[in-house]
């Protein structure tokens, strides 16, 4: 196996604190050869990192987003095997047209990665507004529900194999009273509910649940003190490229026996432990 090691520096809350992260890439350039993949919310953050990884592994990718300038910049960086479509994830009426356009660009869709989502970071149950609640549930849950429904109708109607990958969150594994966590928890339930229904029809459905990752969505958390590291097993923010490696595996044929799984990418922070001591060391 060809293993390429990249060393990256992940910034923590304080500039003086740095951590070195080693990433290993296996079968570089071949594991997704010929795959046609759509990534929603693919212009930045985890979505962009996934698109970049997929292309480097041989796939052709369509990314979506609402800001055309961001999409153009992303495609310029991603290269010739990338394309973009302007699509608002909450535009339920435009879903079938969106999938039709993606099919025309790629010649078909093998995998759909439902990554687009928002968080308003209310911080407290009492701060949640009806407008904010609806906005997050519509974008994170309702849109993904009906996009996946249309995609399954499309694939099953043609007797085609394929896969779907949802990007949820480690917060979905915990009791949560905020709209973001509620919506991601519901997505986990959707993945588990659908997966067994379609596996024998040649379609796999899984999810990855990242911990707090170094993206635009977590800018607020990055202003926190080093106390954050006490709440995370990793003691740092995760990197989008780390999440992308896992996503690549789940879309590849190497994971053909994996279906209906919520794979937490948070170094184990979601795990429940006895006691209240947050020191994870021995």
Language model regions located:
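Conserved glycine-rich cofactor-binding loop
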Residues: 36, 43-45
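Rossmann-fold cofactor-recognition segment
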Residues: 78-93
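Short C-terminal tail/terminal secondary-structure segment
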Residues: 4, 17-26, 259-282
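Catalytic loop of short-chain dehydrogenase/reductase
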Residues: 163-200, 212
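C-terminal substrate-recognition "lid" of short-chain dehydrogenase/reductases
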Residues: 236-265, 270-271
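Substrate-binding pocket helix/loop in short-chain dehydrogenase/reductase
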Residues: 123-125, 129-137, 228
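Short, small/polar-rich loop/turn modules that mediate ligand/substrate recognition or access, typified
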Residues: 199, 204, 258-260
């Amino acid at each position: 196996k060809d293993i390429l090691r990249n060393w990256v520096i992940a910034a923590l809350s304080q500039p003086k604190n740095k951590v070195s992260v080693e990433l290993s890439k296996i079968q570089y350039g071949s594991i997704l050869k010929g795959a046609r993949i759509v990534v929603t919310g693919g212009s930045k953050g985890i979505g962009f990192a996934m698109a970049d990884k997929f292309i480097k592994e041989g796939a052709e990718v369509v990314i979506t987003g609402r800001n055309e300038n961001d999409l153009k910049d992303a495609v310029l960086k991603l290269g010739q095997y990338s394309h973009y479509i302007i699509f608002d994830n909450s535009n339920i009426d435009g879903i079938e047209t969106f999938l039709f356009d993606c099919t025309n660009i790629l010649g078909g869709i093998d995998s759909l990665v439902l990554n687009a989502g928002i968080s308003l970071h209310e911080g407290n149950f009492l701060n949640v507004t009806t407008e904010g609640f609806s906005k997050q549930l519509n974008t994170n849950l309702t849109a993904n529900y009906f996009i996946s429904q249309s995609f399954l109708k499309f694939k099953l109607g043609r007797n085609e194999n394929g896969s779907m990958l949802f990007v949820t969150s480690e917060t979905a594994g915990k009791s949560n009273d905020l709209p973001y966590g509620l919506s991601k928890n519901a997505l986990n339930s959707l993945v588990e509910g659908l997966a067994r229904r379609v596996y024998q029809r040649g379609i796999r459905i899984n999810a990855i649940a990242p911990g707090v990752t170094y993206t635009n969505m977590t800018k607020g958390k990055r202003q926190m003190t080093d106390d954050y590291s006490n709440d995370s097993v990793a003691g740092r923010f995760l990197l989008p490229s780390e999440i992308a490696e896992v996503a690549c595996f789940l879309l590849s044929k190497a994971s053909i026996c994996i279906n209906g799984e919520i794979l937490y990418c948070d170094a184990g922070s979601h795990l429940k432990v006895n006691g209240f001591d947050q020191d994870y060391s021995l």
